[in-house]
């Protein structure tokens, strides 16, 4: 879940 959250954060940043 932490990894998914980080990935989502990066995608949202883009």
UniProtKB/Swiss-Prot annotation:
Cystine pairs: none
Gene Ontology CC entries for this record: extracellular region
Domain of life: Eukaryota
Tissue: Expressed by the venom gland.
GO biological process terms held by the UniProt record: vasodilation
Protein localization: Secreted
Keyword vocabulary terms for this entry: Bradykinin receptor impairing toxin, G-protein coupled receptor impairing toxin, Secreted, Toxin, Vasoactive, Vasodilator
Molecular-function GO term, any one: toxin activity
Family under the similarity heading: Belongs to the bradykinin-related peptide family.
Miscellaneous remark of the record: The molecular weight of about 4 kDa suggests that the mature peptide comprises about 36 amino acid residues.
Described purpose of this protein according to its UniProt entry: Has kinin-like biological properties. Causes contraction of isolated guinea pig ileum and relaxation of rat duodenum. Has a number of hypotensive properties: decreases arterial blood pressure and increases capillary permeability. Induces edema when injected into hindpaw of rat. May target bradykinin receptors (BDKRB). Does not lyse unfibrinolysed blood.
Name assigned to this protein: Kinin-like peptide-S
Species this chain originates from: Lycosa erythrognatha (Wolf spider)
Lineage: Eukaryota, Metazoa, Ecdysozoa, Arthropoda, Chelicerata
